[in-house]
């Protein structure tokens, strides 16, 4: 734990995390290729799928990464793990500005860090995880990582939907700054 007092994760567990969520199915467009998704590519996918992100939404990014790990059946291939599935381009200023302007309250993915790890090099920027810095420290936007989104993404796509009710309470860990979540999607 970090001994966080006023902003410990237990504050969220007292009231839960619940609200409207929207699925962005990057995997349906990009497959398992390692692609750094910038603002233009994300907007193109949102437009093609007619997905609208509104203020207060929890945005789920389905990349297929967690499903790929499960398919490795406890024998992960390090090369595949390092070089597969979409990640957000954390150094894209337009993408970071869209996150701010959209009013989203959580950004969730089925990969390790939501953004590319390590981040793309950029002169003048020392943040190892610039999207984390932007979301967590500047905006207070929560990040969810390594969620198994494939069954939900498939159901939503098969039923022509993108929105659902997401309930994702963190564990009650006094003083901690993060926690595993126990998410439930209601469709």
Question: Residue spans of the language-model regions?
Answer:
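Active-/binding-site microenvironments in catalytic and ligand-binding cores
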Residues: 1-187
């Amino acid at each position: 734990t970090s001994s966080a007092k006023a902003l410990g994760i237990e504050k969220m567990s007292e009231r839960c995390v619940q609200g409207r969520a929207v699925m962005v199915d990057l995997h349906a467009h990009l497959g398992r290729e390692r692609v750094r998704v910038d603002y233009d590519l994300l907007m193109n996918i949102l437009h093609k799928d007619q997905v609208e992100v509104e203020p207060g939404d929890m945005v789920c990014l389905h990349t297929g990464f967690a499903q790929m790990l499960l398919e490795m059946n406890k024998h992960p291939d390090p090369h595949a793990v390092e070089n597969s599935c979409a990640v957000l381009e954390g150094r894209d200023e337009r993408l970071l500005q869209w996150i701010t302007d959209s009013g989203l309250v959580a950004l969730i993915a089925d990969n390790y860090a939501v953004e590319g790890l390590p981040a793309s090099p950029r002169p003048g920027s020392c943040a190892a995880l610039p999207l984390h810095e932007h979301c967590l420290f500047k905006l207070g936007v929560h990040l969810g990582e390594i969620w198994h989104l494939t069954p939900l993404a498939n159901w939503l796509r098969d039923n022509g939907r993108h929105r659902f009710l997401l309930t994702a309470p963190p564990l009650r860990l006094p003083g901690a700054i993060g926690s595993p979540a126990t998410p439930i999607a209601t469709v």
